[in-house]
């Protein structure tokens, strides 16, 4: 069964909402049915960026396990690891570092954000 452009747009919007809300199980089902793991919204935010920024470690782990690009920056050149660091999601930062996230990518980079906010990296 194929989706109309309108239906696909709604599924993609729901996918971003699930990443933002930490709906890991539901998002995983969407991925199982063909939603791209590196899907981005109109602002360039990937599913991983939204999950990381909103401190949803379980969702971040699932997306990493499914091959999400840990360095995919949004339209403002922000990386998922810098977003997680900004929000104080230390567990997510460690997870992204463990997955090989580039700490010097983006503006500001995770290193720059850590220095600005006095957080260890």
Regions found by a protein language model. Give the residues of each.
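Ankyrin repeat boundary signal
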Residues: 39-40, 70-73, 103-106
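Alpha-helical segment of the N-proximal tetratricopeptide repeat
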Residues: 10-29
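Conserved ankyrin/ankyrin-like repeat signature
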Residues: 26, 58-59, 91-92, 120-121
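Ankyrin repeat domain, specifically the short helix-to-loop turn at the C-terminus of the second helix
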Residues: 28-36, 61-69, 94-102
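TPR-adjacent "capping" and linker segments in tetratricopeptide-repeat scaffold/adaptor proteins
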Residues: 1-9
């Amino acid at each position: 069964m194929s989706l109309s452009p309108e239906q696909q747009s709604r599924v993609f919007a729901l996918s971003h909402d699930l990443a933002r809300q930490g709906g890991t199980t539901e998002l995983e089902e969407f991925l199982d049915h063909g939603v791209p793991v590196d899907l981005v919204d109109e602002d360039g935010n990937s599913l991983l960026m939204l999950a990381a920024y909103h401190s949803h470690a379980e969702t971040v782990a699932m997306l990493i396990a499914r091959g999400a690009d840990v360095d995919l920056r949004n339209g403002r050149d922000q990386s998922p690891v810098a977003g997680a660091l900004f929000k104080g999601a230390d567990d997510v930062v460690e997870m992204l570092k463990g997955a090989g996230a580039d700490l010097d990518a983006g503006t500001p980079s995770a290193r720059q954000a850590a220095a600005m906010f006095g957080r260890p990296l």
